[in-house]
């Protein structure tokens, strides 16, 4: 009887241990704390009834062009894009434009480059929000910013968009949150020469580099699920760029696992030199914090 009880106890401990291990390896991507460097509202469009927004709202439905809505918009306008497939590149060179995908019955609007177009969404205005889109099959970039400040890029699914998935450059005060990216041949999320950027609660996988902070300052990277890339998290200085330094970067509470994917970066590119199996790479950057 004692032998049976011992066996039972051992089996019970094993089962509990396996259960604890399973839950311990489940990434927690829903922090209750406010962003650290980004200053502004991170309220999601899903927090309100997006279809009841009437004032300053332009609607785009399948068969329409999103770019025509941008051309009509004035600063402060909301552009609602309904589910459907849109084959175009969208340029936003105005301030304070909120571009929301409307999710209906689980379906989102899709920007499809058909392996012919270079970029999906390019913005240079300040106060830009881009939320709730599927972006796929572009040759260059999914979402790229050029000197746009006070931006929010949130809850987008970006697949197979060539060089970069999300790429703000020369921007200040930005939030990149709750996005899902894969199949990117350089960096899925690439923060280039920016200041005061929070990168939170994203999932990046099956890309060459997961999240890359290059020549940027005051950046927080936290609560991200970074898995099955060639390299996971990176912070470094690339010589020869207008901004020469990279410092005050915090990597915190990220779940980085199994970054052993084959490096399929373009020959001659910087990321092509990242060894497969790299979880965290810090090169020539200063004041980098890695915790939890």
Q: What do these predicted ranges mean?
A:
Residues 1-13:
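N-terminal Sec-pathway targeting helices
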Residues 14-24:
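Hydrophobic alpha-helical membrane-insertion segments, chiefly the h-region
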Residues 25-51:
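Ser/Thr/Pro/Gly-rich low-complexity linker/stalk segments immediately outside membranes or between
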Residues 48-87:
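Acidic Gly/Asp/Thr-rich repetitive segments characteristic of extracellular carbohydrate-active
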Residues 59-62, 83, 96-139:
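Right-handed parallel beta-helix/beta-spiral solenoid domain characteristic of secreted/periplasmic
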Residues 70, 89-93, 103, 118-124, ...:
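Glycine-rich beta-solenoid repeat tracts in large extracellular/virion proteins
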Residues 100-102, 108, 126-137, 149-163, ...:
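Right-handed parallel beta-helix
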Residues 253-255, 269, 273-292:
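Predominantly extracellular beta-rich ligand-binding scaffolds that present long acidic/polar faces
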């Amino acid at each position: 009887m004692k032998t049976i009880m011992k066996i039972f106890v051992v089996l019970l401990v094993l089962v509990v241990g396996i259960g604890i291990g399973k839950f311990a390896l489940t990434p927690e991507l829903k922090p209750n704390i406010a962003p650290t460097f980004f200053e502004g509202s991170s309220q999601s469009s899903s927090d309100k009834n997006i279809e009841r927004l009437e004032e300053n709202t332009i609607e785009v439905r399948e068969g329409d062009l999103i770019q025509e809505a941008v051309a009509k918009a004035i600063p402060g306008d909301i552009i609602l894009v309904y589910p459907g497939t849109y084959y175009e590149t969208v340029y936003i060179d105005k301030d304070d434009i909120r571009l929301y995908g409307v999710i209906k019955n689980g379906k989102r609007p899709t920007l499809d480059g058909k392996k012919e177009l270079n970029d999906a969404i390019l913005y240079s205005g300040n106060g830009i929000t881009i939320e709730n889109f599927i972006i796929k099959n572009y040759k260059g970039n999914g979402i790229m910013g050029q000197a746009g400040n006070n931006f929010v890029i949130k809850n987008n699914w970006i697949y197979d968009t060539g060089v970069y998935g999300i790429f703000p450059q020369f921007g200040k005060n930005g939030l990149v949150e709750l996005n899902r990216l894969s199949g990117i041949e350089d960096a899925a999320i690439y923060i280039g020469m920016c200041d005061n950027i929070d990168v939170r609660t994203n999932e990046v996988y099956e890309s060459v580099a997961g999240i890359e902070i290059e020549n940027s300052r005051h950046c927080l990277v936290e609560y991200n699920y970074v898995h099955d890339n060639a390299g996971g998290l990176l912070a470094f200085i690339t010589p020869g760029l207008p901004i020469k330094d990279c410092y005050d970067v915090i990597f915190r509470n990220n779940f980085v696992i199994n970054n052993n994917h084959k490096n399929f970066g373009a020959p001659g590119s910087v990321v092509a030199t990242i060894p497969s199996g790299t979880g965290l790479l810090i090169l020539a950057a200063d004041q980098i914090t890695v915790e939890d």
